């Protein structure tokens, strides 16, 4: 069993385990991620968020999101707000940029503990958005995808 320092944050009902690897390199296997996210085996969460240094130094940090099934995924809106607040709080900033699989996301403090994140342009191509039970005959579905698929 390994011991790691982690933080738990909540953003509008989604909860996250945050692991900061900027100082100590911690490699987690897919099974370890699953166990940490499992509410019966570990602290449990919707997603695990890993903080790494941005090697290109264009952003405050490189962020990787993992779903509870252990799979890496794109940026989550609520997770991006939580991690941006975490990063801004430690440096007493009111703006931040995070480098994610979904691109570089800009965040700003809009209140004492409120954060707004520009998630970029949403995907309106419903055939490329993960959905269940849709009809191949449907011509238009009226919803965009602006973040990752949650398991």
Which residues does each predicted region cover?
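A glycine-rich beta-to-alpha transition motif near the start of alpha/beta enzyme domains, typified by
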Residues: 1-111
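ATP-dependent small-molecule kinase catalytic core of the GHMP/sugar-kinase superfamily
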Residues: 1, 92, 99-151
């Amino acid at each position: 069993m390994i011991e790691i320092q982690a933080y738990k944050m909540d953003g509008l009902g989604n909860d996250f385990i945050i692991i900061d690897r900027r100082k100590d390199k911690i490699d987690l296997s897919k099974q370890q991620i699953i166990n940490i996210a499992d509410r019966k085996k570990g602290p449990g969460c919707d997603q695990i968020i890993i903080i790494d240094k941005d090697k290109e130094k264009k952003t405050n940090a490189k962020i990787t999101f993992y779903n509870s099934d252990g799979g890496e995924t794109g940026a989550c809106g609520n997770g991006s707000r939580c991690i941006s607040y975490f990063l801004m709080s430690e440096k007493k900033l009111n703006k931040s940029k995070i480098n994610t699989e979904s691109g570089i996301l800009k965040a700003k403090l809009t209140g004492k503990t409120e954060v707004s994140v520009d998630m970029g342009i949403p995907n309106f191509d419903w055939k490329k958005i993960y959905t269940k039970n849709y009809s191949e005959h449907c011509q238009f579905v009226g919803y965009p995808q602006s973040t990752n698929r949650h398991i």
